[in-house]
Amino acid sequence: MIQALLVIICLAVFPHQGSSIILESGNVNDYEVVYPQKVPALLKGGVQNPQPETKYEDTMRYEFQVNGEPVVLHLERNKGLFSEDYTETHYAPDGREITTSPPVQDHCYYHGYIQNEADSSAVISACDGLKGHFEHQGETYFIEPLKISNSEAHAIYKDENVENEDETPEICGVTETTWESDESIEKTSQLTNTPEQDRYLQDKKYIEFYVIVDNRMYRYYNNDKPAIKIRVYEMINAVNTKFRPLKIHIALIGLEIWSNKDKFEVKPAASVTLKSFGEWRETVLLPRKRNDNAQLLTGIDFNGNTVGRAYIGSLCKTNESVAIVQDYNRRISLVASTMTHELGHNLGIHHDKASCICIPGPCIMLKKRTAPAFQFSSCSIREYREYLLRDRPQCILNKPLSTDIVSPPICGNYFVEVGEECDCGSPQACQSACCNAATCQFKGAETECRVAKDDCDLPELCTGQSAECPTDSLQRNGHPCQNNQGYCYNRTCPTLTNQCITLLGPHFTVSPKGCFDLNMRGDDGSFCGMEDGTKIPCAAKDVKCGRLYCTEKNTMSCLIPPNPDGIMAEPGTKCGDGMVCSKGQCVDVQTAY
């Protein structure tokens, strides 16, 4: 039988109540003081409950007053906070990797709610007093112990009463140029789901989450690994709560501290660091420790006001299921909000627009924030559901705890169970290129999962280790294409003939060289470039990289496609054997790229 405790917290007269005080979260200018006193619940007959075998109870209740009104805070231990095979890694001074599997299941991190308030929630650490936050009557309150010798005093305060370390809004570094219009999103959301899609959306999703702490952050906290661990645990407990409305469970599968040095160069340019981190996860981390998503917590100050960056709609992709977050504030709630925001991007969620709302605010996916965020907006929930149905990411369907699986595995139910490597639904519904829908096993390595679109594309092959087809890759620039009529350039195969057909139609082709020799004149109609408004004539070797000339088939004309500024040969166009156009010159293809 699970033991329950009733703890009465009495509001006491405190000499500094309501004045400014320095807490772990920062300077707080208005607060209430309470003194928790544990009172064990009694069994029938007045007999006291026996002490539990574990250090921390599975459930607890706390009664106290907020603004003079009594409330009861119900807490349940977050049993799924750590994955069953959770590990911790740090490095010796000589660079030797040290990995352990510490006993973390008897932990002190809780979720909860205010009794008789349907929409309330709470995130509490009970390791050393009560620390965290709870929602009460639509407002968020924070609680933490006061550092007073031989005292059980705690402070309760609101976010608005904390003096910000920096008034500058925190900014997500994700730049979005592919926002759908409101109209297109609305049309998509109005489509009727099939029963199978509805079941898939309702199934609980699981993300095995790996956190890396870089060397700057390690040194900032005075090389104190236990303190860093507690900070990360509290963050993940908060992140876990924020994703519950989306039916996603976040389980920490690993924590790694770069205690000797960074494993790649962490730079102030967030986009560069994100790319490096994704490559490190793909080539170094995944071969030694499985995970669905990884985040880098860093002590570096990113350029501008950026505090985080992530790829959009990239969950389960080996080099893109990552995000980077700056540990920019002592307040755990702020950094945890950024971690949640960036993981939201990985789950296909864009930044909220002005029309997106959530209660209480601010919304998690706002691009700029100065306060902790606790709720996803209706826009975010809709985009997440659309991402699930569109991309069907496989890695979030397997439960991290094998003990939770009690029913026999069924191939085709979208749930990765014992004996299965993947599950993409029925063969008719499966949209995974590297999962065998009939066997629920990964397709073998070298199985083609994406055909080459043309000469300048490359086919993609399954890895045999994932249900996802690898990221689309291209032929290198300069690779011959279209029967040696051109050379690949940024996915295309530019040729003078194709340029004429595109501009004038299928009855046209490129003109003979005699027409291009006119480009040596450098007049209004024929030139290779411009400098300070003056047209520059072409050198003899560069004439095919200047003004474009086309000829109607079965004629001898030299036509210039109509354009006031002239149509020039496109960059990368073949201008001779082993030669391509670059900035109005015909250069060797080997040196051009």
From Swiss-Prot:
Reported tissue expression: Expressed by the venom gland.
Record EC number: 3.4.24.-
Which residues take part in binding Ca(2+) 2? 410, 413, 415, 417, 420, 423
Kindly list the places in or outside the cell where this protein is found, as annotated in its UniProt entry: Secreted
Residues bound to Zn(2+) are 341, 345, 351
Q: Enumerate the active-site residues.
A: 342
**Propeptide feature ranges:** 21-191
InterPro entries attached here? ADAM_Cys-rich (IPR006586), Disintegrin_dom (IPR001762), Disintegrin_dom_sf (IPR036436), MetalloPept_cat_dom_sf (IPR024079), Peptidase_M12B (IPR001590), Peptidase_M12B_N (IPR002870), Reprolysin_adamalysin (IPR034027)
User: Subunit info?
Assistant: Monomer.
Q: Which family does it belong to?
A: Belongs to the venom metalloproteinase (M12B) family. P-III subfamily. P-IIIa sub-subfamily.
Name it: Zinc metalloproteinase-disintegrin-like atrase-B
Source organism of this protein record: Naja atra
